[in-house]
A protein has these predicted regions:
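Extracellular/mature segments of secreted proteins
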Residues: 59-62, 92-101, 175-178, 209-219
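Extended amphipathic alpha-helical interaction segments
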Residues: 104, 108-183
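Surface-exposed, polar/charged faces of alpha-helical domains
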Residues: 39, 54, 58-65, 152-155, ...
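Bacterial N-terminal signal peptides that target proteins for export
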Residues: 1-7
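N-terminal Sec/ER secretory leader and immediately downstream segment
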Residues: 22-119
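A cross-kingdom marker for long, charged
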Residues: 188-241
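Cleavable N-terminal signal peptides
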Residues: 8-9, 19
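N-terminal signal peptide c-region/cleavage motif recognized by signal peptidases
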Residues: 14-18
Length: 241
């Protein structure tokens, strides 16, 4: 059985870190995202996302755009975790772990490259609707119960990254889409990300207070771009299988 990380994985992370006193925000973010910074896990997720986007685009679109259902991945494992796709890359499925938070951005990128490989992407800078993302209460961390502080910090900084990414996408959607052709975790990716961020000075007020791995920054840009293209009238790609 393919293992899925969801709410219980996040809770387990809280248990593992909540006892650490005075941990810096950066250390919390580093530890949280380090679980997917091994390269091979990302390659498998990337392969799975591309295969699923081609075989089951409607299911992939529903999962990417529905960020409120924490059990969405479990509900549609047949399509979203297609074992046939996994076996094309890895001969076993029992040891495969899928984290929705890492998988959703990769599916978004795969859907973008499937839908708009010709470059005919809808303009997103005129989309007035706000993207659906968590809105955290504006309270100081000292007011948060110690048990929830780690997840509060993670949600806070992830939300800041989402706002920063959305700002960049609204200004540089073509450059963000071009980022998809760079290999994952490569020098080309790092260079492209740096250039995109440098060319978006108007978004600096939204820049997170902590740094994120390149694959997280890339993924969040792709997630915001896909979400905005759907709001701009972009269509779900058709299955190629």
């Amino acid at each position: 059985m393919v293992r899925l990380i969801g709410l219980f994985g996040a809770v387990a992370f809280c248990f593992s870190t909540s006892a650490v006193a005075q941990t810096s925000d950066q250390a919390v973010i580093d530890q949280y995202w380090a679980r997917w910074n091994d390269g091979e896990g990302l390659k498998l997720l990337n392969h799975l996302a591309k295969c699923v986007a081609e075989r089951h685009p409607a299911a992939a679109d529903a999962f990417v755009t529905n960020t409120t259902d924490a059990t969405a991945l479990q509900k549609d494992q047949e399509h979203l975790v297609d074992t046939g796709c996994i076996k094309k890359y890895w001969f076993r499925t029992s040891s495969t772990t899928i984290d929705p938070e890492a998988y959703r951005p990769m599916l978004a990128e795969a859907l973008l490259t499937t839908s708009y490989s010709s470059g005919s992407i809808p303009a997103v800078n005129a989309v007035t609707a706000e993207l659906d993302r968590p809105r955290l209460p504006n309270v100081p961390i000292e007011k948060v119960h110690p048990y929830y502080r780690v997840m509060f910090l993670i949600d806070k900084h992830n939300a800041a990254l989402a706002g920063y990414s959305e700002c960049i996408v609204r200004q540089q959607q073509d450059a963000v889409l071009a980022l998809a052709v760079t290999p994952l975790n490569s020098e080309e990716e790092a260079t492209a990300l740096a250039e995109i961020e440098k060319a978006s000075p108007n978004c600096d007020p939204y820049r997170p207070d902590v740094s994120f791995p390149s694959y997280v920054r890339r993924g969040d840009l792709m997630l915001q771009l896909y979400s905005l293209t759907r709001l701009a009238g972009g269509q779900v790609p058709q299955s190629r299988s």
